[in-house]
Every structure is written in structure tokens, then in C-alpha cells.
């Protein structure tokens, strides 16, 4: 029986079909992959074979690059190989590069890792996919997927996949991260100091001071610039400056500057000095200074503590200290050089006895009034005691009676010619000072307070000389003699005793005694006078003229 002849195409198909079914074919999805350090990656690989799957062996090999595709890409040799159609990263012998077995698996068994990958997280999944967890620095190279199937001798048993690890990029990222960390630390440090704040990033180290207020920073900056430019712009220190509450300001230390702040004319006119070659001032500084000056209220009253401290003007010496010290002003009597020593002694004693206690605080004008009466002193010395006695008898008819009664009631008193100068005529309503013996017995008594009438008349006679003697009631008289006292009738003496001055608490007021005494007694009398002046000054709290 003869077989029919088949056409030629069918004959070729029948002969090629068994050969194609018995061959091995390996395929990969990507021939080149990029990955960073410590990342995970899956290298896809698949195959077709006629052999049994349990007999197929999958092997992944690693070969390093001949030339690095990253660092050597712009080299001349690399570019020349690319121009010739070659692959300079993989076109070299295996003895010129490093070759390692990564993993191997037979059938569906567990993969076996290579010697250099025993501690790595690497596995083979699906048919032939390689999974690498945490890519390392030395994983940068070419990976070959090789399939071994028994009985398949033809075909392409392996495929390559380039794994490019961007380790240089990771290094750059690490460096940048370190710089960012330092910058973050610096930012947090700046945020903790608001006056030097440089950004507005919220930091975990100091969350309470983050997001610096722009107005506070600008105010602080303007104040520092104003303090730096203040001494250059003003010729004199700003005693009445805007910052009254500042401790550096000298405003509270000068009480004269606090006088009449509400009056525009009381403000000191401070000259402005023209400065040359000064750096330009920012507009913000000028605007801030103008705003502060507009808000300045010069008529604002002083705080109560400053009013209490500087309520009255003080002298130059007292203004240097922290407390106002009350001082007594003591004026010595003027010296008369044309008199003899005995006359100067007696006159100074009379001036000490006859100087009244001032009834108001001491004034410089009152102190100057002592020097306006040199003619009055000379007139007293020229006229003598006799002329004063004659005038006293002519003006006062009852003077002779009082003269006699004083001699009857008191012991004999001897007056010198110079001591009788104290008996100048004056009004009978002025106060007078007692002599030493009654004063010693009554030194503890407070002086009586003058009546309003006496104060008014004494104020009217303030410019009169102080060396006058008051009226001597109840028969005490420095002009009396023994004969006048004998001629005085008893009824007159009794009448004078009954009608003594109501200002004296006792019946017999103190009397003047003679000042013609020994030097020892004179010194004791001076001491008593000085003690009396000190005691009166301590009682009154006012100045005393000695």
C-alpha cells in the first residue's frame, strides 16, 4: 500500500515540532533594576521546559561589574565601548571580577543560600523569582538566572539582570540628613532664645518658644539700635528721656528736673549735635522712635514713692546722699575790731543774752539782716547808758517807780557801763530772756507759746535790732538805784506785785544780773547760754543763731 505524499510545508512542521518541544527557554521581566541601600527588591525570572518540575534546578549567581555604570559612565573607555556596541559593565572574563552563588533550589524544596549569604534575608519564590530584603552595599552587580532541566540540551539556559545599588545616593542622603539634624538642633537652640530667633519651625525640644513673634523681635531689635545710636545723636544725656522707669536713667536722681513737668516752658531745651559720617538708620527704627515719642506723656504725675522722696528741693550736699539730712545753720556774731577786748567780751555776752529765739524756720534773708545795722551798734556805744536812762524817764513816767521797786525787792545789783547797753528802749510787749540764776532753776520748763498779737507785732519789728531789753515787771529793773528803790511807796510796790504780767507763771519773774564777773564765771555763763541754745533748738527743731 503506498503512502500519499505530503506537501513540503507539512513535512517541515512535523520535523520541527518535536525539536521545539524538547528545548529550554528562560525569560526575565527587567534586565536592569535600580535600588537604594537597605531596600527590598524582587528579581523576576521564568522558564519553560519539557522536563519534570521536581527535577529542575534554579540557580542565582552574582557577578560584579567590570566597570561601574555609575562612577565610570563618563569615562573615555566606557564611552568608547558604548560607541562600539559593547557593554563595558559586563563584557569581561569571570577571572577579572567576583563571582558568587546567591541561592539554589531543586524542584519545590527550600532554597539553599550561598556561603556569603547565609545570614541574609534572601529567598526564591514562585518558579524562579529572587527576593532580596535589605539590599547591601556589595549587592551592586549582575545577577544570572540559570535553569538546569534534565533531557533539555538545547535552548538558552540563563538570563542576566543588572542590579544597580545607589549606594552613593544613600551616602549623600546620610550626609544631608546629618546636616539637617545639625540644622534642626540649631533651629531649636535659636527658638529657645526669642531675641535671636531665626525661623518659624516648631521644634520638639522647646515647643513653648517656637514660632517667634515678629513684633517682639522687631521691638527688641529697634531698642538695641536706639540705645546704640542714642549717645551719638544727643549732645547731653537724656535726663527727661522717654524711659522714666529705667534704672539707668538719671531722671529720678535729680529732683529739680521733676518740677512743673506739666508746663511746656519747664522742659529743658536740649541742643542737637550734628553728627557726621553716621551709618544710615533703617526706616523701621525711625518709625518706632517716632511712635514712642508720640506716646510719651510728659504731664504724667510722678509715682508716690518719688513724690515722697523728692517732695522738697534739697541742697547740693544732701542730694548726693540717699536720705535728706536736716542740718542746723549756726552763725557766729560779727567781730568789732575797733573796740577793746573787754568791751568786745561784754558786748558779745549781751548779744548772746539778748538774741531772741526765732519763731519760724531760719531764712538766709533773716541771717543777712544782722549785717545791716553797724550804725545802730555805734550809736549804742556813743550814747552810753546814761542817755538811755534819761530818755527812758522822759518817755515813761512810771519807770522811776519800777526802778525803785526793783531795788527794794531784789538784792543790790551792780551793772557796768558797758553792760547797760543792753537796756535799749523797746516795746513793752516783746519777750525777754531771764538771767542765769533763774534760768538754772527753770531750765526744764518749756518756753511759753506767744500770743497772736505778740507774733504779729514781733513780725512787724523783725528788722529792728535784736539788742533790746523787755519790760521788767514787778520791780526788777537794771536801771534802778538804791535811792529810787527807797523813794518808791509801799502801796505802789504792792500794786505792782498784784498787777504783774499775766504771761509769767510766777509772781516774781527772773531778773538780769551783772555780767562784770570773773573770767571763770564768765566761761560758765557762756556754757549755760550755749546749752540753753542747744536745748531750745532741740525743742523747736529749727536753726539757732549763736
UniProtKB/Swiss-Prot annotation:
The modification Phosphoserine is found at residues 499, 501. It comes from the Eukaryota. Disulfide bonds join 45-145. Residues 24-162 form the Ig-like V-type domain. It is linked to Deafness, autosomal recessive, 42: A prelingual, non-progressive form of non-syndromic sensorineural hearing loss. Sensorineural deafness results from damage to the neural receptors of the inner ear, the nerve pathways to the brain, or the area of the brain that receives sound information. Maintains epithelial barrier function by recruiting MARVELD2/tricellulin to tricellular tight junctions (tTJs). Crucial for normal hearing by maintaining the structural and functional integrity of tTJs, which are critical for the survival of auditory neurosensory HCs. Mediates fatty acids and lipoproteins-stimulated CCK/cholecystokinin secretion in the small intestine. In the inner ear, may regulate alternative pre-mRNA splicing via binding to TRA2A, TRA2B and SRSF1. This is Immunoglobulin-like domain-containing receptor 1. It comes from Homo sapiens. The lineage of its organism: Eukaryota, Metazoa, Chordata, Craniata, Vertebrata.
